[in-house]
Amino acid sequence: MKHVYITAKLVLAAWLIAPLTLLADEGMWQPHQLPAMADELKAKGLEIDAESISRLTEFPMNAVISLGGCTASFVSAQGLVVTNHHCAYGSILHNSTPEKNLLKDGFLANTFDEELPASPGSRVYVTEAVTEVTKKVVTGLDALKGNAFYQAIEQNEKALIADCESGGGYRCQVYSFHGGLEYYLIKQLEIRDVRLVYNPAGSIGKYGGDIDNWMWPRHTGDFSFYRAYVAKNGSPADFSEDNIPYQPKSFLKVSAKGVSEGDFVMVTGYPGRTNRYRTANEVENQFEWAYPEGKQLRERLMEIIEETAIEGSDERIKYEGLLAGLANYAKNFTSMIEFYGKSPMLAERQDREQQLTNWINQNKQRKQRYGETLSVLDGLIVQSQQHKERNLIVGYMRYTSMLPTARRLYRLANENLLEDMVREPGYQERDMIRFKSGMERIDRRYAASVDRAMLFEMIQRYANLPGEERIPAFDHAFNIGTTLDEVALNAVLDSMYANTQLDDLDTRLAWMTKSVGEFKASQDPFIKIAVAMYDTDMASEKKDKALSGQFMKVRPQYMQAIIAFNRDQGKPVYADANSSLRVAFGHVKGYSPQDGLRAQPFTRLEGILAKDTGNDPFDSPAEQLELIKQKQYGDFYLEAIDSVPVNFLSTLDTTGGNSGSPTLNGRAELVGLLFDGVYESIIGDWGYDPKTNRSIQVDSRYMLWVMKYLDKADRLLDEMELVYE
């Protein structure tokens, strides 16, 4: 099957001819698409020029930044960065001890000198350019198949990245859009000195905890502040006391006036992943197998952490971040399963595919071009699911530390034998600072007792797989026979954790430069397993890449058919989220979660009082409760609700990765921080529903209220530019 591509202009045309009224509030749009939407956006409430949102080096887009997994924004001329509390979680935990628990008590630096280094590997990424490179990635590769095609694409991407990063100080990446139909090279300034400036107490920043997670009404102060630092000449640099605050080209003003019900809002950020063009087979497997299995595994790992690490202990502090992440997606998967069961999603996907097939067969040229696409794609999907049980269990072993660390280090030793451009992504010279940071982070995220318990659980599950699904090298490494001898396994693990030296940072860093021969001679038990598993790992990876190469040939054909079909149907087309910069538009609006109930778009300070029990996670600081009782609203009062708004709902189309995204009004002033979605909208990753799709934002007025009246963060309030009109 011939590999095809279309240019950005053709994709743009695919939705341009659709009536703009169909766009509603759905869509995560690429910045270059926005000028064509100018009239509709103006009618919705956008007051700035839509063209300016497409120019990444100008306000407001150059004030919006990525943290590598979360979004954030500059809010002062001195590199002050605001994001979610849960996005700064790792840095808060990194600087916490049982004696000085910043997660519990909060933290405020009163001077620049008091600002704390963020967790190792923390970065601020400022997107400066997005360039379409489809031809440079895929031209001349039609004759290649499978692994050869995958490797050729990868090499072309590496060459583009190397050229992009040649000037230093930048991190570049090639992103695939529409399943490989388009490729874009994204260039980002990489700021490496990031410091924690302020986070409210956990009883504000994580108020409601896992109980309120994904729920409405919500009363969470999910905000924290970083600062970006650079060398005195303005270039990115590693942490140094001589570094100075970065001066961004622009920053966002923070609105103290906020928004009201019905107001226009937009969000800019880096949404992680959506699946709105996946096939019926993929939907069925994900909802009827992957989500239920993943939910159960995550809940079991949570139990292990809670059973093994006593609350308040140093071990527990180290695992709070992982615990929060596991809980977050366990609840996410629960919602996915629940609302899939209530929805006609599978039938709708099957119907869409039948309509697509009928449309293709109505035209000889279409049939010649796309006739086999869906059946070939479905065949690859079935093939990719053949070892799903084993792959899931082995994949969840990544939540342990020692075994994955040993395997990464030995892989590095092997990759170091190759020329840099031939090495696997993640093991090139450009990746070594990140690699080292990963080794450094382990110290504050690892406890042997917890790691051992999680690995024991995963090996137990692995041992219950059918014999044909087992991996001989893995069985041999852990002395697993036809049946599992748990007593023997316990003895093996006890010995491994007692005798490894990979729990020492200096040892891990030293292994980064050692030879393959030194690894083979090592007596460290985890390194011995990494060496024993290596050939099997590489053979498995080669098969996976060959299959991925086949997908990379077929998926673009499928997406081209979908785009052409949607164009004929008068439907807009936007790419699934892929962690690249996007813009979404919507309004402040409540919703009806179920028959007979109407959720208002704002929550109030008084809702905190009503929820508070004095016990975690509903244990607001006593001073905060007293301020609320006194109706100390100050400058942040909203007459329509007779209080200070805490959180608000919007129709913005967002997903994971948007956390920390600035929610802006029509003048591009910050009116909130996006931090969650309602429980009913989690399934929106697979399809937008205007009736229930709601994002949850921290209201800027609540953030400012906490800063001014509770935490006395006057230095930061004076530094930011607040707008009261």
Give, region by region, the residue ranges found by the protein language model.
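Bacterial N-terminal signal peptides
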Residues: K9-P19
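Positively charged n-region of N-terminal signal peptides that target proteins for export
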Residues: M1-A8
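Terminal presequence/propeptide segments associated with secretion/organelle targeting
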Residues: L20-E725
